[in-house]
Protein backbone atom coordinates (compact mmCIF):
# COMPACT_ATOMS: atom_id res chain seq x y z
CA UNK A 1 0.00 0.00 0.00
CA UNK A 2 1.52 3.33 -1.05
CA UNK A 3 1.73 6.38 1.17
CA UNK A 4 -1.42 8.13 -0.06
CA UNK A 5 -3.50 4.95 0.06
CA UNK A 6 -2.36 4.36 3.65
CA UNK A 7 -3.37 7.89 4.63
CA UNK A 8 -6.79 7.54 2.96
CA UNK A 9 -7.57 4.04 4.25
CA UNK A 10 -10.89 3.88 6.14
CA UNK A 11 -11.29 7.67 5.97
CA UNK A 12 -14.72 9.20 5.40
CA UNK A 13 -13.53 12.63 4.31
CA UNK A 14 -10.39 14.66 3.66
CA UNK A 15 -10.69 18.44 3.55
CA UNK A 16 -9.14 18.80 1.08
CA UNK A 17 -7.41 16.04 -0.89
CA UNK A 18 -5.71 18.59 -3.12
CA UNK A 19 -4.21 20.35 -0.10
CA UNK A 20 -3.08 16.99 1.28
CA UNK A 21 -1.26 16.04 -1.92
CA UNK A 22 0.39 19.47 -2.00
CA UNK A 23 1.50 19.02 1.63
CA UNK A 24 2.98 15.58 0.90
CA UNK A 25 4.98 17.03 -1.98
CA UNK A 26 6.23 19.88 0.19
CA UNK A 27 6.97 18.13 3.50
CA UNK A 28 8.71 14.83 4.12
CA UNK A 29 7.31 14.52 7.65
CA UNK A 30 4.04 16.47 8.03
CA UNK A 31 2.55 16.89 11.49
CA UNK A 32 -0.88 15.55 12.49
CA UNK A 33 -2.79 15.43 15.75
CA UNK A 34 -5.86 14.09 17.49
CA UNK A 35 -7.29 15.51 20.70
CA UNK A 36 -8.95 13.20 23.21
CA UNK A 37 -11.13 14.46 26.03
CA UNK A 38 -10.24 12.25 29.02
CA UNK A 39 -13.73 11.67 30.35
CA UNK A 40 -14.23 7.91 30.55
CA UNK A 41 -13.20 4.55 29.21
CA UNK A 42 -11.56 4.18 25.82
CA UNK A 43 -13.79 2.24 23.43
CA UNK A 44 -13.49 0.97 19.87
CA UNK A 45 -14.83 4.27 18.55
CA UNK A 46 -11.72 5.98 19.94
CA UNK A 47 -9.54 3.19 18.58
CA UNK A 48 -10.66 4.09 15.06
CA UNK A 49 -8.73 7.37 15.24
CA UNK A 50 -5.81 5.62 16.95
CA UNK A 51 -5.68 3.26 13.96
CA UNK A 52 -5.53 6.27 11.66
CA UNK A 53 -2.66 7.76 13.67
CA UNK A 54 -0.80 4.46 13.32
CA UNK A 55 -1.37 4.63 9.55
CA UNK A 56 -0.03 8.17 9.51
CA UNK A 57 3.05 7.15 11.51
CA UNK A 58 3.73 4.43 8.94
CA UNK A 59 3.33 7.09 6.25
CA UNK A 60 6.08 9.18 7.86
CA UNK A 61 4.01 11.71 9.81
CA UNK A 62 4.99 13.24 13.14
CA UNK A 63 2.11 12.53 15.52
CA UNK A 64 0.86 14.58 18.46
CA UNK A 65 -1.81 13.30 20.83
CA UNK A 66 -3.50 16.01 22.88
CA UNK A 67 -4.75 14.70 26.21
CA UNK A 68 -7.30 17.46 26.65
CA UNK A 69 -7.63 17.64 30.42
CA UNK A 70 -8.66 21.30 30.44
CA UNK A 71 -11.34 20.60 27.82
CA UNK A 72 -12.74 17.81 30.00
CA UNK A 73 -12.74 20.12 33.01
CA UNK A 74 -14.61 22.84 31.08
CA UNK A 75 -17.09 20.21 29.90
CA UNK A 76 -17.79 19.33 33.54
CA UNK A 77 -16.30 15.83 33.40
CA UNK A 78 -14.51 16.12 36.75
CA UNK A 79 -11.90 18.10 38.65
CA UNK A 80 -8.58 18.81 36.98
CA UNK A 81 -6.98 16.16 39.18
CA UNK A 82 -9.61 13.57 38.22
CA UNK A 83 -9.40 14.18 34.49
CA UNK A 84 -5.58 14.18 34.62
CA UNK A 85 -5.69 10.65 36.06
CA UNK A 86 -8.01 9.58 33.24
CA UNK A 87 -5.64 11.22 30.75
CA UNK A 88 -2.78 9.09 32.09
CA UNK A 89 -4.97 5.99 31.63
CA UNK A 90 -5.73 7.10 28.06
CA UNK A 91 -2.03 7.48 27.28
CA UNK A 92 -1.22 3.95 28.47
CA UNK A 93 -4.08 2.57 26.37
CA UNK A 94 -2.98 4.38 23.20
CA UNK A 95 0.59 3.10 23.47
CA UNK A 96 -0.62 -0.46 24.12
CA UNK A 97 -2.85 -0.20 21.03
CA UNK A 98 0.18 0.34 18.85
CA UNK A 99 1.19 4.01 18.79
CA UNK A 100 4.98 4.23 18.78
CA UNK A 101 5.90 5.56 22.23
CA UNK A 102 9.17 7.03 20.99
CA UNK A 103 7.61 8.75 17.98
CA UNK A 104 4.40 10.08 19.53
CA UNK A 105 4.33 13.47 21.22
CA UNK A 106 1.84 13.25 24.09
CA UNK A 107 0.78 16.70 25.30
CA UNK A 108 -1.51 17.59 28.20
CA UNK A 109 -3.74 20.56 27.55
CA UNK A 110 -2.86 22.02 30.94
CA UNK A 111 0.80 22.18 29.84
CA UNK A 112 0.09 25.13 27.53
CA UNK A 113 -3.60 26.10 27.52
CA UNK A 114 -3.34 28.25 30.65
CA UNK A 115 -0.64 30.48 29.18
CA UNK A 116 -1.17 34.11 28.16
CA UNK A 117 -0.47 33.63 24.43
CA UNK A 118 -2.92 30.76 24.14
CA UNK A 119 -5.70 32.54 26.01
CA UNK A 120 -5.19 35.73 23.99
CA UNK A 121 -5.71 33.75 20.79
CA UNK A 122 -8.86 32.16 22.19
CA UNK A 123 -10.18 35.64 23.01
CA UNK A 124 -9.30 36.91 19.54
CA UNK A 125 -11.17 34.00 17.97
CA UNK A 126 -14.17 34.62 20.23
CA UNK A 127 -14.65 38.02 18.57
CA UNK A 128 -15.41 36.43 15.19
CA UNK A 129 -17.44 33.34 16.18
CA UNK A 130 -21.11 33.73 17.04
CA UNK A 131 -22.67 32.05 20.05
CA UNK A 132 -24.93 30.03 17.75
CA UNK A 133 -21.94 28.78 15.76
CA UNK A 134 -20.11 27.72 18.92
CA UNK A 135 -23.18 25.95 20.23
CA UNK A 136 -23.79 24.10 16.95
CA UNK A 137 -20.20 22.92 17.00
CA UNK A 138 -20.61 21.49 20.49
CA UNK A 139 -23.96 19.87 19.69
CA UNK A 140 -22.45 18.11 16.70
CA UNK A 141 -19.98 16.17 18.83
CA UNK A 142 -22.70 14.76 21.03
CA UNK A 143 -22.82 17.36 23.74
CA UNK A 144 -26.27 18.80 23.06
CA UNK A 145 -27.18 20.94 26.05
CA UNK A 146 -30.39 22.58 27.16
CA UNK A 147 -28.62 25.11 29.34
CA UNK A 148 -24.91 25.24 28.42
CA UNK A 149 -22.34 27.04 30.51
CA UNK A 150 -20.01 29.66 29.07
CA UNK A 151 -17.13 27.20 29.55
CA UNK A 152 -18.79 24.77 27.15
CA UNK A 153 -19.08 27.49 24.52
CA UNK A 154 -15.35 28.19 24.87
CA UNK A 155 -14.61 24.52 24.18
CA UNK A 156 -14.76 24.62 20.33
CA UNK A 157 -12.77 27.86 20.25
CA UNK A 158 -10.01 26.21 22.26
CA UNK A 159 -10.07 23.20 19.97
CA UNK A 160 -9.47 25.46 16.98
CA UNK A 161 -6.63 27.28 18.72
CA UNK A 162 -5.11 23.92 19.72
CA UNK A 163 -4.55 23.18 16.04
CA UNK A 164 -2.66 26.45 15.65
CA UNK A 165 -0.64 26.34 18.86
CA UNK A 166 0.44 22.72 18.40
CA UNK A 167 1.82 23.66 15.00
CA UNK A 168 0.24 20.77 13.14
CA UNK A 169 -0.60 20.54 9.47
CA UNK A 170 -3.50 18.11 9.84
CA UNK A 171 -6.32 17.74 12.36
CA UNK A 172 -7.64 14.18 12.62
CA UNK A 173 -10.95 13.25 14.21
CA UNK A 174 -14.27 11.54 13.79
CA UNK A 175 -16.72 13.06 11.33
CA UNK A 176 -18.56 14.45 14.36
CA UNK A 177 -15.66 16.92 14.72
CA UNK A 178 -16.32 18.41 11.30
CA UNK A 179 -18.08 21.61 12.40
CA UNK A 180 -15.30 22.46 14.84
CA UNK A 181 -12.66 21.73 12.22
CA UNK A 182 -14.48 23.89 9.66
CA UNK A 183 -14.60 26.68 12.22
CA UNK A 184 -10.81 26.38 12.47
CA UNK A 185 -10.34 26.33 8.69
CA UNK A 186 -12.46 29.44 8.24
CA UNK A 187 -10.98 31.51 11.06
CA UNK A 188 -7.38 30.59 11.86
CA UNK A 189 -6.01 32.33 8.78
CA UNK A 190 -7.51 35.59 10.05
CA UNK A 191 -5.37 35.23 13.18
CA UNK A 192 -2.21 34.68 11.15
CA UNK A 193 -2.11 30.88 11.29
CA UNK A 194 -2.09 28.28 8.54
CA UNK A 195 -5.37 26.70 7.44
CA UNK A 196 -5.35 23.07 8.61
CA UNK A 197 -6.13 20.04 6.49
CA UNK A 198 -8.75 17.82 8.14
CA UNK A 199 -9.02 14.04 8.03
CA UNK A 200 -12.30 12.60 9.29
CA UNK A 201 -12.99 8.99 10.17
CA UNK A 202 -16.47 7.43 10.31
CA UNK A 203 -18.47 7.11 13.52
CA UNK A 204 -18.99 3.51 14.56
CA UNK A 205 -22.46 2.30 15.46
CA UNK A 206 -23.07 0.52 18.72
CA UNK A 207 -23.16 -3.27 18.76
CA UNK A 208 -26.95 -3.20 18.53
CA UNK A 209 -26.88 -1.09 15.37
CA UNK A 210 -27.83 2.13 17.19
CA UNK A 211 -25.73 5.00 18.53
CA UNK A 212 -23.17 4.03 21.16
CA UNK A 213 -24.34 4.72 24.71
CA UNK A 214 -22.87 3.67 28.04
CA UNK A 215 -26.37 3.02 29.40
CA UNK A 216 -26.98 0.41 26.67
CA UNK A 217 -23.66 -1.42 27.07
CA UNK A 218 -23.57 -1.56 23.28
CA UNK A 219 -19.85 -0.93 22.81
CA UNK A 220 -16.53 -2.61 23.50
CA UNK A 221 -14.16 -0.94 25.96
CA UNK A 222 -10.46 -1.60 25.49
CA UNK A 223 -10.25 -3.08 28.99
CA UNK A 224 -13.21 -5.45 28.60
CA UNK A 225 -12.37 -9.05 29.50
CA UNK A 226 -12.25 -11.77 26.85
CA UNK A 227 -15.48 -13.19 28.22
CA UNK A 228 -17.23 -9.82 28.08
CA UNK A 229 -16.25 -9.34 24.45
CA UNK A 230 -17.49 -12.79 23.42
CA UNK A 231 -20.73 -12.12 25.30
CA UNK A 232 -21.26 -8.69 23.75
CA UNK A 233 -20.49 -9.82 20.21
CA UNK A 234 -22.70 -12.87 20.50
CA UNK A 235 -25.65 -10.50 21.08
CA UNK A 236 -24.54 -7.96 18.45
CA UNK A 237 -26.63 -7.06 15.42
CA UNK A 238 -25.44 -8.88 12.28
CA UNK A 239 -28.36 -9.35 9.91
CA UNK A 240 -27.59 -11.47 6.85
CA UNK A 241 -27.03 -9.25 3.82
CA UNK A 242 -26.88 -5.97 5.77
CA UNK A 243 -23.52 -4.38 5.01
CA UNK A 244 -24.38 -0.73 5.70
CA UNK A 245 -25.20 -0.72 9.41
CA UNK A 246 -23.56 -3.92 10.56
CA UNK A 247 -21.33 -3.46 13.63
CA UNK A 248 -19.65 -6.86 13.20
CA UNK A 249 -18.57 -6.05 9.65
CA UNK A 250 -17.41 -2.64 10.90
CA UNK A 251 -15.08 -4.32 13.40
CA UNK A 252 -13.50 -6.30 10.58
CA UNK A 253 -13.25 -3.33 8.25
CA UNK A 254 -11.93 -0.70 10.64
CA UNK A 255 -10.09 -2.69 13.30
CA UNK A 256 -9.16 -6.20 12.20
CA UNK A 257 -8.17 -6.06 8.53
CA UNK A 258 -5.88 -3.01 9.02
CA UNK A 259 -3.85 -5.10 11.50
CA UNK A 260 -3.92 -8.53 9.83
CA UNK A 261 -2.97 -9.41 6.26
CA UNK A 262 -5.01 -12.63 6.39
CA UNK A 263 -8.17 -13.37 8.36
CA UNK A 264 -9.23 -16.93 9.16
CA UNK A 265 -12.89 -17.54 9.96
CA UNK A 266 -12.86 -20.71 12.02
CA UNK A 267 -15.77 -23.12 11.74
CA UNK A 268 -16.33 -26.91 12.07
CA UNK A 269 -15.67 -29.18 9.10
CA UNK A 270 -19.34 -30.16 9.01
CA UNK A 271 -20.14 -26.52 8.17
CA UNK A 272 -17.45 -26.29 5.48
CA UNK A 273 -14.29 -25.81 7.54
CA UNK A 274 -12.18 -22.70 7.94
CA UNK A 275 -12.34 -19.84 5.43
CA UNK A 276 -9.45 -17.47 4.71
CA UNK A 277 -9.87 -13.89 3.50
CA UNK A 278 -7.14 -11.49 2.43
CA UNK A 279 -9.29 -8.35 2.14
CA UNK A 280 -12.37 -6.87 3.73
CA UNK A 281 -14.10 -6.64 0.34
CA UNK A 282 -13.64 -10.38 -0.19
CA UNK A 283 -15.21 -11.15 3.17
CA UNK A 284 -18.10 -8.72 2.65
CA UNK A 285 -18.91 -10.29 -0.71
CA UNK A 286 -18.98 -13.72 0.91
CA UNK A 287 -21.32 -12.40 3.59
CA UNK A 288 -23.69 -10.94 1.00
CA UNK A 289 -23.62 -14.26 -0.87
CA UNK A 290 -24.50 -15.99 2.43
CA UNK A 291 -21.46 -18.25 2.23
CA UNK A 292 -20.41 -17.30 5.75
CA UNK A 293 -22.77 -17.31 8.74
CA UNK A 294 -23.16 -14.30 11.07
CA UNK A 295 -22.26 -16.40 14.12
CA UNK A 296 -19.00 -17.49 12.49
CA UNK A 297 -18.16 -13.82 11.91
CA UNK A 298 -19.06 -12.94 15.50
CA UNK A 299 -16.84 -15.65 16.96
CA UNK A 300 -13.91 -14.72 14.73
CA UNK A 301 -14.36 -11.00 15.43
CA UNK A 302 -14.25 -11.72 19.16
CA UNK A 303 -11.05 -13.73 18.74
CA UNK A 304 -9.23 -11.01 16.78
CA UNK A 305 -10.49 -8.10 18.90
CA UNK A 306 -9.29 -9.93 22.00
CA UNK A 307 -5.86 -10.34 20.40
CA UNK A 308 -5.75 -6.62 19.59
CA UNK A 309 -6.80 -5.62 23.10
CA UNK A 310 -4.68 -8.12 25.02
CA UNK A 311 -1.69 -5.70 25.26
CA UNK A 312 -4.02 -3.09 26.78
CA UNK A 313 -5.21 -5.50 29.46
CA UNK A 314 -1.61 -6.34 30.34
CA UNK A 315 -0.68 -2.67 30.68
CA UNK A 316 -3.69 -1.90 32.88
CA UNK A 317 -3.22 -4.85 35.26
Swiss-Prot record:
Annotated Pfam families: tRNA-synt_1b
Family, per entry: Belongs to the class-I aminoacyl-tRNA synthetase family. TyrS type 3 subfamily.
Subunit and partners: Homodimer.
EC assignment: 6.1.1.1
Protein role: Catalyzes the attachment of tyrosine to tRNA(Tyr) in a two-step reaction: tyrosine is first activated by ATP to form Tyr-AMP and then transferred to the acceptor end of tRNA(Tyr).
Organism for this UniProt entry: Methanosarcina barkeri (strain Fusaro / DSM 804)
A GO MF term: tyrosine-tRNA ligase activity
Protein's UniProt name: Tyrosine--tRNA ligase
Enzyme class: ligase
Sites where the protein binds L-tyrosine: 33, 155, 159, 162, 177
Sorted UniProt keywords: Aminoacyl-tRNA synthetase, ATP-binding, Cytoplasm, Ligase, Nucleotide-binding, Protein biosynthesis
Recorded catalytic activity of this chain's protein: tRNA(Tyr) + L-tyrosine + ATP = L-tyrosyl-tRNA(Tyr) + AMP + diphosphate + H(+)
One GO CC term, this protein: cytoplasm
Extent of the signal sequence: none
PANTHER family linked to this entry: TYROSINE--TRNA LIGASE, CYTOPLASMIC, TYROSINE-TRNA LIGASE
Compartments (UniProt record): Cytoplasm
SUPFAM superfamilies in alphabetical order: Nucleotidylyl transferase
Binding site for ATP: 214
Gene from which this protein is expressed: tyrS
Motif residue range(s): 'HIGH' region: 38-46
'KMSKS' region (motif): residue ranges: 211-215
HAMAP family cross-referenced by the UniProt entry: Tyr_tRNA_synth_type3
Alphabetized InterPro entries for the sequence: aa-tRNA-synth_I_CS (IPR001412), aa-tRNA-synth_Ic (IPR002305), Rossmann-like_a/b/a_fold (IPR014729), Tyr-tRNA-ligase (IPR002307), Tyr-tRNA-ligase_3 (IPR023684), Tyr-tRNA-ligase_arc/euk-type (IPR023617), Tyr-tRNA_synthase (IPR050489)
Amino acid sequence: MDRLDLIKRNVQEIVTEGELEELLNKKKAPRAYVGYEPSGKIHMGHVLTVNKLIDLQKAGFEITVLLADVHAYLNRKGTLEEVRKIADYNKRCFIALGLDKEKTNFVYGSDYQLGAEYMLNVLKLSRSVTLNRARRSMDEVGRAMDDPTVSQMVYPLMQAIDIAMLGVDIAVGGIDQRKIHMLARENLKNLGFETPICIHTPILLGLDGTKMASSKENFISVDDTEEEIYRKLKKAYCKIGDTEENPILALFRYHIFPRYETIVIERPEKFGGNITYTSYEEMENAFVAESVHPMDLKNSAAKYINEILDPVRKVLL
